[in-house]
């Protein structure tokens, strides 16, 4: 009987030793090359699969989003204004009077919401963004409220939007 137990112990020792020998080592974390100098005031490099922050420079700094605001404006317009895409858009003096890059809206210009979205996203038209907001939101203020609600719903809880085009005060 003792011989059988000895054989089992020896077999288990060899078996577990072999098993330990055959188990591959855990993978090493990736090694990234040093980051090049970043000229931006703030930057974040995130792993898109895991959400892990790989590198950052002033990543928590609140900054103006500039024309990236128009992306949120476009998302809301496509989600909430889909039925209005081919309808004539609202063009007000507020839209016409926007500073910066514009598509040249005029009050007598028939233009669809669909065309405004192109003008807003391809030309970065600030006037187009305001007209999109007034057409989709029913009012300028109503659309700004929609923007802030959407931002919270997608996790941008530290964001606050004051206009649909990203112009600073």
What are these regions (language model features)?
Residues 1-2, 113:
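Structural motif marking the loop-to-transmembrane transition
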Residues 2-20:
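Sec-dependent N-terminal signal peptides of Gram-positive bacterial secreted proteins and lipoproteins
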Residues 21-169:
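Active-site-adjacent loops and short helices of periplasmic peptidoglycan-processing enzymes
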């Amino acid at each position: 009987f003792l011989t059988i137990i000895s054989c089992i112990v020896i077999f288990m020792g060899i078996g577990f030793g072999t098993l330990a020998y055959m188990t591959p080592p855990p993978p090493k974390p990736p090694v990234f090359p040093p980051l090049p100098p970043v000229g931006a005031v703030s930057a974040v490099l995130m792993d898109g699969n895991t959400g892990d922050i790989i590198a950052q420079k002033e990543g928590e700094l609140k900054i103006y989003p500039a024309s990236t605001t128009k992306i949120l404006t476009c998302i809301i317009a496509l989600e909430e204004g889909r039925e209005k895409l081919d309808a004539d858009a609202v063009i007000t003096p507020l839209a016409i009077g926007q500073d910066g890059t514009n598509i040249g809206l005029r009050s007598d210009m028939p233009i669809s919401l669909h065309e405004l979205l192109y003008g807003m996203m391809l030309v970065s038209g600030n006037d187009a963004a305001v007209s999109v907001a007034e057409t989709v939101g029913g009012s300028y203020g109503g659309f700004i409220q929609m923007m802030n609600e959407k931002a919270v719903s997608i996790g941008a809880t530290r964001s606050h939007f004051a206009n649909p085009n990203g112009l600073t005060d």
